[in-house]
């Protein structure tokens, strides 16, 4: 599968440069129509991104919002992260779609909200109905502490891959770790298929960028701990330090500032940051590669769960089903460049499907074991 990815990555990023978040002109019913409805109800055009990257996309498959029961009532959502405001935009679209529905979101980092949820559950003061997290580890932590309720088969069956759903939470938007690189410094054939090579080969010394305070990086290191143990992970981290990597505040900055400006040649980030950079800078000397069968190829997921003690548990689960609707999945795929979680919606452009990636064999729920990762990063001197 690597040959296919190597031949399409540059074409994908070039197409991504034409993408934006403005709406497509056209349909007025949710998945198309003759324009006869003059209401303000959002259409597929409002959910979908625009530009060359989506111009040839067919209507999404899966379960349409029109085929789901109406959302009615008030809902409180604990929103972990929010992906630069995109998740709150999706909530706003659902609020606009239903006259008698109002979801409000309180946004904090997923790990912080997970601790808040468990504390509230233990004290019997649950304040929200839904936990929408950017990572499976936080979802698992909340579930492991008994703070969620089981989802019905109507909800869990909507997720097309068993790796990204449990009885307690459902994945809604997948993401992969990746290796963005500066094409003025490296070609596709220069990028190894292993993060070990990046940490040990002399040709990468002094040309690496990373964001070690970032939650996504902690998830990556946690995955490495699960795969090779603490000692093996410590060895890799020390090898990376020997490469003298440049430090950035976020993975977006690693790409937009470090790699794009040539401060560094490559980095370790989530797959969508290079695409977001291309959306505003289509001439950036930037491309994207994937490692294979190691923590650098980890595929994680944002997801949602219904909280134990929720004031509106039935409405909360119906909201989760709406996040898995054809329209919401199209939104997440074309605006956030995420990997869709339902059958019938494809990733944008020639971005590989999850099945075409080579992630390691790993239970995503093990990513909740983050505290030993923080302690390890502190011990080797990466965090203080």
Predicted regions and their residues:
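Extracytoplasmic ligand-binding site segments that recognize negatively charged/polar headgroups
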Residues: 73-76, 80-88, 108-111, 126-263
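Sec-exported extracytoplasmic/periplasmic mature domains
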Residues: 92-100, 118, 122, 136, ...
């Amino acid at each position: 599968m690597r040959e296919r990815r190597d031949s399409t990555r540059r074409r994908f990023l070039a197409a991504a440069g034409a993408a934006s978040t403005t709406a497509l002109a056209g349909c007025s019913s949710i998945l198309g129509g003759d324009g006869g409805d003059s209401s303000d109800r959002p259409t597929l055009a409002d959910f979908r991104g625009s530009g060359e990257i989506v111009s040839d996309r067919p209507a999404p498959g899966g379960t349409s919002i029109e085929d789901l029961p109406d959302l009615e009532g008030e809902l409180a959502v604990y929103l972990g992260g929010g992906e630069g405001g995109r998740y709150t935009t999706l909530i706003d679209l659902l609020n606009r779609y239903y006259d008698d529905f109002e979801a409000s979101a309180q946004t904090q980092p997923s790990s912080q909200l997970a601790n808040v949820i468990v504390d509230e559950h233990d004290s019997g003061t649950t304040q929200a109905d839904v936990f929408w997290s950017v990572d499976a580890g936080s979802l698992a932590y909340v579930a492991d502490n008994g703070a969620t309720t089981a989802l019905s088969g109507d909800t869990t069956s909507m997720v097309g891959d068993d790796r990204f759903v449990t009885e307690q939470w459902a994945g809604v938007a997948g993401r992969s770790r990746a290796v963005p690189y500066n094409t003025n410094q490296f070609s596709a054939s220069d990028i190894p298929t292993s993060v070990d090579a990046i940490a040990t080969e002399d040709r990468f010394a002094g040309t690496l960028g990373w964001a070690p305070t970032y939650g996504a990086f902690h998830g990556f290191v946690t995955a490495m701990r699960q795969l090779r143990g603490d000692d093996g992970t410590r060895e890799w981290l020390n090898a990376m330090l020997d490469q003298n990597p440049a430090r950035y505040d976020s993975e977006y900055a690693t790409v937009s500032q470090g790699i794009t400006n040539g401060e560094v040649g490559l980095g370790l980030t989530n797959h969508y940051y290079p695409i977001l950079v291309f959306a505003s800078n289509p001439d950036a000397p930037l491309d994207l590669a994937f490692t294979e069968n190691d923590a650098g190829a980890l595929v994680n997921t944002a997801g949602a769960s219904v909280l134990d003690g929720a004031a509106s548990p039935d409405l909360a689960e119906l909201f989760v089903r709406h996040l898995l609707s054809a329209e919401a999945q199209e939104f997440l795929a074309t605006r956030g460049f995420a990997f869709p979680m339902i059958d019938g919606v494809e990733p944008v452009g020639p971005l590989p499907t999850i099945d075409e990636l080579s992630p390691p064999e790993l239970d995503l729920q093990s990513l909740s074991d983050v505290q030993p990762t923080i302690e390890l990063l502190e011990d080797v001197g990466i965090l203080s």
